[in-house]
Amino acid sequence: MEYAVTNMRLLSNMMYSASAISFPRVRLHCSIPTEPSCRRNPFRQSNQPVQVPSPKLACFDGVLTEAFQRLDVSENNSPVEAFAYVLELCGKRRAVSQGRQLHSRIFKTFPSFELDFLAGKLVFMYGKCGSLDDAEKVFDEMPDRTAFAWNTMIGAYVSNGEPASALALYWNMRVEGVPLGLSSFPALLKACAKLRDIRSGSELHSLLVKLGYHSTGFIVNALVSMYAKNDDLSAARRLFDGFQEKGDAVLWNSILSSYSTSGKSLETLELFREMHMTGPAPNSYTIVSALTACDGFSYAKLGKEIHASVLKSSTHSSELYVCNALIAMYTRCGKMPQAERILRQMNNADVVTWNSLIKGYVQNLMYKEALEFFSDMIAAGHKSDEVSMTSIIAASGRLSNLLAGMELHAYVIKHGWDSNLQVGNTLIDMYSKCNLTCYMGRAFLRMHDKDLISWTTVIAGYAQNDCHVEALELFRDVAKKRMEIDEMILGSILRASSVLKSMLIVKEIHCHILRKGLLDTVIQNELVDVYGKCRNMGYATRVFESIKGKDVVSWTSMISSSALNGNESEAVELFRRMVETGLSADSVALLCILSAAASLSALNKGREIHCYLLRKGFCLEGSIAVAVVDMYACCGDLQSAKAVFDRIERKGLLQYTSMINAYGMHGCGKAAVELFDKMRHENVSPDHISFLALLYACSHAGLLDEGRGFLKIMEHEYELEPWPEHYVCLVDMLGRANCVVEAFEFVKMMKTEPTAEVWCALLAACRSHSEKEIGEIAAQRLLELEPKNPGNLVLVSNVFAEQGRWNDVEKVRAKMKASGMEKHPGCSWIEMDGKVHKFTARDKSHPESKEIYEKLSEVTRKLEREVGYVADTKFVLHNVDEGEKVQMLHGHSERIAIAYGLLRTPDRACLRITKNLRVCRDCHTFCKLVSKLFRRDIVMRDANRFHHFESGLCSCGDSW
C-alpha cells in the first residue's frame, strides 16, 4: 500500500511540476491545455461522470466554489489528491484567502505522513498568490522536503521577483544532495536571465550537458532566453542552430524575441521569414516579435506585409495582443493614420491600446494631436493610467502649454498618481519647459521617492531657466547624498557654471569628476566648452589635447571656444586638422567655422568651407543657409551672398533677415527695403530682429524718412514694442542726417528710460557734428549709466581730446588705469595665400615687417607727391607734437595691412581688409587715394560697416 501511495505521489509530482513549473511559457505560447489528458479528476465518482474544465476556465466557471462545496460534503472521504487539486485551483485564481482556509483544514484533517505531499502544493499555491512569506514558512517547516517542494519554492521566488533567493536556494539544494530533475532548470535559468548572471547560467548549462538534458526542447528555449537576456546573442543563436527539431513554435519565438528585444531588427525579420518558409506556423507571439522588430520608417513596408498576413488569418486579426503590437509598430514607423484606423476597427481596445496611440503622437512630435486624442479618450469614458499620463504631460511640456499641464497635474492628484515616480519626473520636466521653476521646485519637493532622473531633470530645469545658483545648490545636495552622478547632471551643472563664469566652481566640479573617475569623452567635451566660455583657453586646450578618442564634438567644442575667445585663425586651423583626421563635420561644427571665417573676413577660407559642405551633401537651408549668406556678406562678397540667397528654395524669416542685414552692412539700404517689401508680400511676418536689420540698413544708407516709417509700421501694424536697439538705430539715423537736436529731443521723449547704448549713439553723433552742449549731456549720462565700460570711456576721452580738453582726457584715462580697464588695441587683418595675417598699430612682429614698412613709406611718398596728400593730424587724439602725430597715423594697422597687400598681390587685385575698430577719417582718405592712384579696389570692414573703395570714392559717401 505504501509503495502504491509513494508511486502515486511521484506520478502526481511529475505531472504537476511538468505542467505548472517547467512549461509555463510553453502553455501560453502554444495554447497547450493546462490539464494533461491523462490527469484523473479527483472528484470523479463512478456513478456520476464529471467533466472538469481547465484551471484557466475554472477561474470563471465557479469550479473553485464547487470544489469547496464537494470538500464540505465529503470531507472525511476526500482523497489527498482532491485537496491538492483545490490548492492548485486557488493558486491559479490567486485566491489566497481561500487557500489559507484550506491550509488550516489540511493540517486538521490529514496525518503527518501525508502532509509532505500537500505541503509542496501549499508552497505552490502561496507562490502563485504572491505570498512569499507564507510559502517560505511552509517550506521551512517541512521535515522532509521533496524535490518537488524545492523546485516549487525556486519557482515561487522567480515568479515573485526574487531571483537571487532562487539561486541561493538552488545552491542549498545542491549542498543537501537533493537530486536534480528536468523540471528544476527552467526557473533557475530564468533567474539567471533576470539577474544577468551569465556565470551561473553557463554553469547550469554545463550541468545540463552533463546530465544529458541540454537537447530537450523546453530546456533549449530557456537557455536561448537566458543567453539573450545576458547580451550573448551569439551563444543563443548557436543553441538554436544546433537544435535539430525546430518544429516547435516556442523555440522560434524564444530566438525571435531575443533578437527583437535586443534591437536586432534585421536579424529578427530574417528569422521570421525563414520560419514562415521552413518552420512551424507562426502564432500570435511570433507575429508580435516580428512587429516589434519593425522599428522606424525603413521597416514600414515590412510591417505592412506582416499586417497583411495577419488580416488573412481569422485567428490573429482580432487578438488584442496582436492589434496592440500593430498599433505600436505603425506609431514607431510614423504612420499614425494607419494606427488610428486599427483602433477604430477594434472592439476590445484596452488601456494599452490607448497608451500606444498617445505615446505614438508624442514620439512623432504631434503634441497637439496627443492632447486632443487624450481629451476625446476621457470624454468617451475610457480610463487612463500612469503610463498615458506620463506621455500626455510630456506633450504639454513640449508645447509649453502651461494651462494644459496644470490641468493634467490636477487630474493626476485627483487619481492619486502624483506619487508615481515617472509621473513626478515628467511633471518636473513639463514645468521646466514652461519656464515655471517655482512649480517645478514644488513638484520635485512633493515627490516621496526620487531617483537619479528626478535630480537630473530638476537640475537641468534650473540650469535651462537661468537659475544657475539653484542648480549648483542641488548638485551639492546630490554629492552629499553620495548618489551616482551621471553625464547628464554633470553636463547641466557645467553649463550652469559656464554662464556664471565662475572658474572656481568649474575647477571644483572638474576635481570632483577626476576623484570619482567619471571622466570620459562626453565630459571632456563639456569641459572644453565650459573652459572656453569662462575665457580660459589654457585649460580648454589642455583638456582637449588629453582626449584620446577625439570625436566631432571634441573638435567642435575647441573650434567654438577658440572663435569665442577671438582666436578665429586658430579655429580655422583646428577645422583643417579635424578634416585631415578623416572626421566629417556636422552642422554644429560648420556653423562654428563659418562664423569664424566671417569674423576674419577670410573669403578664401569661407569659400573652401562652402565647397566642403556641398561635397558632404549639406543642403542650403535653415541655419546653414543663413550662416553661408552671413559669411559671404562679412567677407565683403555681397554678390556671392545674394547668389546663395537666391538658391535657397524655402526662404523663411531667418533667411530674409540675414540678406537684409547683408545689404545693410554694405550700405545698400534701398535693396534692403525692396527685399523687406518682398518678404512681406510673401506673407512672411517680420519680427524684432528683422526690423532691427532694416533700420540698420536705413541708417547707413541715409534713408531717414523710410526709417521713421518702418518704426511706425513696427509699432502699429505688427504691434511690436521697440527694443532699445531700435531706438539706437533711429538716434544714429538722425545723427548721420545732422539732425542732432532732433535726436536729442527724441531721446528725451522716449517711452522708456534711455539706455547707455542710446546715449552712446547720441554722443557719437555729437562728436561727428561738433555739437558740444548736447555731447556734454550725453557723455555725463553715459558715464552715470556705465562708469566701468571701457568702450564708453574711450569714446568720452576721444570727444574731450577733439575739443582740446586734455586735463579731462587725463582724468578719464587715469580712471581707466585705476580700474584696471584697457582699451582694445586697434588691429587689422588680411587673408593671403590661405593664411590670415594680423597687424596692430606700428606692428613690427611680422617676418616681412621691413619690406612692409618700406612699401608703406613708398606709397605715402607717392600720394604726397602726385595727389598732394597731407596727413590730417587733428584725428590723432594724443597730446604730442605734430611730427609724432604724423608717425602715429603712418603706423595705423589698416595702412600696414594695405601695404602688405600691395606687396604680395598682383596689380589690380582686390584687397580685402578687416579692422576691429572704426576707421579714422585720415585713413579713410588714405584708402580712397590708394584705390585711385594704384587702381586697386579695397573692401574694408570696420566696426561700423563695409567700405568699398573704388577709383577714389567710397560706398559710404564719407559718412560712417
UniProtKB/Swiss-Prot annotation:
First and last residues of the transit peptide: 1-64
Matching Pfam families = DYW_deaminase, E_motif, Eplus_motif, PPR, PPR_2
InterPro entries, alphabetized: DYW_dom, E_motif, Eplus_motif, Pentatricopeptide_rpt, PPR_At4g14850-like_plant, TPR-like_helical_dom_sf
List keywords of the entry alphabetically: Chloroplast, mRNA processing, Plastid, Repeat, Transit peptide
Q: Name one GO molecular function term.
A: mRNA binding
Annotated segments matching region Type E(+) motif: 834-864
Q: Phenotype when inactivated? A: No visible phenotype under normal growth conditions.
Q: Where in the cell is it found?
A: Plastid, Chloroplast
Q: Main subcellular localization, coarse class?
A: plastid
A GO BP annotation = RNA modification
Show me the PPR repeat boundaries. 79-109, 115-145, 146-180, 181-215, 216-246, 248-282, 283-317, 319-349, 350-384, 385-419, 420-450, 451-485, 486-516, 520-550, 551-585, 586-620, 621-651, 652-686, 687-717, 723-753
Coiled-coil ranges (or none): none
Q: What GO terms fall under cellular component here?
A: chloroplast
The answer to whether the entry has keyword Transit peptide is yes
Q: Region Type E motif: start and end of each range?
A: 758-833
Region (Type DYW motif) residue ranges read 865-960
Q: NCBIfam families per the record?
A: PPR
Q: What does this protein do?
A: Involved in RNA editing event in chloroplasts. Required for the editing of a single site in rps14 transcript.
The UniProt family comment states: Belongs to the PPR family. PCMP-H subfamily.
Q: What is this protein called?
A: Pentatricopeptide repeat-containing protein At3g63370, chloroplastic
* Underlying gene: PCMP-H83
